[in-house]
Amino acid sequence: MRRLNRKQTLIFFYAFDIVLVIAIALFSIPFSCSSRSTLESKDESMLDPANAGSVVKIELRNHKTEKSVVISREGSMWIGTDSNSNNILKWPCRKNLPESFIAEASRKIHMVNKARNSKSHENFSLEKGNCLEVNFCGPSGEIYSSLFFGDKNAVTKKICYRTFSSNDVWEIESHIEDFLSTDADFWVDPYIFPQCVTGLSDQESSSLLRHGKLAYVKPSPSIKPLKVFEKNFDNTAKGIFSFYEKDGSYIVIPMFTGGISFSEDDSDAVKSLSYRYSISQLTYKKFFEREEK
């Protein structure tokens, strides 16, 4: 057998070392990925379930559009206001919607870490001027959870978020995105006779007339309403509805007082409602056909 000279021997051992290093590196990749995956994922809720029952205010702000909605619990009711009226006009929330939002935020979900520094926030639409902010607040003004949400990924259908106190970006698959709206019409009770006033269930209210979009207008004191209608509900609550004609449709301004079974806080809540909304000519006609028969 031919013996290798010194130079050939060194080349052989160098080549063997290189192959060995590559083999070790390739062999360790699955373990590295597995370990990294374990470290970068977790099952956690965005809102501590222990605080869920104490949430009395939810703030939503879209930093891209500068629109905001604030929902507050007053008595047993949820009352909303929004930036379109400079948070002046108050409207009743859609029944059970705030509770469903809180429940979804406090549900434990699977999260995967996508980034760990603020420089990556722009890649996920999570920088301060481009995200949607949600704050869940307690009775003393404390913020239980401050969250920032980016855009939904068109491919994975998932959404990323971060918290106020951390730069970590987490990707989640959650129904939380169903509630991430600063459109007041999404949150407002859709019925002309709101459920917080009537006390009716969803099934009982399903046949009631619905109103159109919220209106941010203030009729001049010199303009008298076209019609004023008073409604006494079965629970002894009362509503007064003023109808104004505008551009082929109608603007309705309701006022309410609570019934005898209402707590003081609930009575104050319904009395504070100051919203107004539009209805179509058809809805106007149906309303008086039903109520004046």
Please give the residue ranges for each predicted region:
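Secondary-structure "cap/kink" motif recognition
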Residues: 1-293
